[in-house]
Amino acid sequence: MSDCVIHTHWAGPMGNMQYVIQSGSEALIVDPAWDIPELQAIVTQHGLTVVGILLTHEHYDHVSGVPECLALNKVPVYISEYAHYDPPVPMVLNRLAVGATIPFAGHTIAVLHTPGHSPGGVCYQLGKQLITGDTVFVDGCGRADFPHSDVAQLYTALFETLWPLPDDTVIYPGHDYGPTPTDTWGNQKKTNRFLQSETREVFLRKRKG
């Protein structure tokens, strides 16, 4: 998917990074929670048609703007089938099973099941581009002390699901918490202290600490 352009919009009190993924004249919006008019302005500026909304997980700071987005764009909303809501969200969702794919502008987006920070955590792989949500940040990873978090699942997500990805894959996290907004996966293996855990037990201690 080398022809995909990822536009970033920084918003909210927690350094959220929301994305508009462009391929040709089509667009996907990722994790709309803040400043929906500004996200829509990116769409309009580039003459795009929104064809879907991708949610990396179910936390409020990643989904709260979906109803406003849907008022502007009547499109499918994609999220993991394992996402947990309390209370339930008032919208129709396309639940993604493990191994699911999403067609986009003649391409295929791979949905990588990465729970741990939340039950519904997923990453979206677009060739050498990876939308990671709160699974992994630049030089960090998602917290695992929320209700329904599971630090052991987070270890599996990082070291079994994501670890084999090509080193030149560029990660696009859900928050701007690092020295740079994005980075290559290979560089993160060298600089991210959570990814430098020698064993599962070491990682669990680091993330719980």
Q: What would you call each of these model-derived segments?
A:
Residues 9-10, 93-94, 113-115:
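Short Gly/Pro-enriched turn/cap motifs at secondary-structure boundaries
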Residues 15, 27, 34-110, 190-194, ...:
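Active-site HxH/HxHxD metal-binding segment of metal-dependent hydrolases
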Residues 19-22, 99-126:
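Core dinuclear metal-dependent hydrolase active-site scaffold
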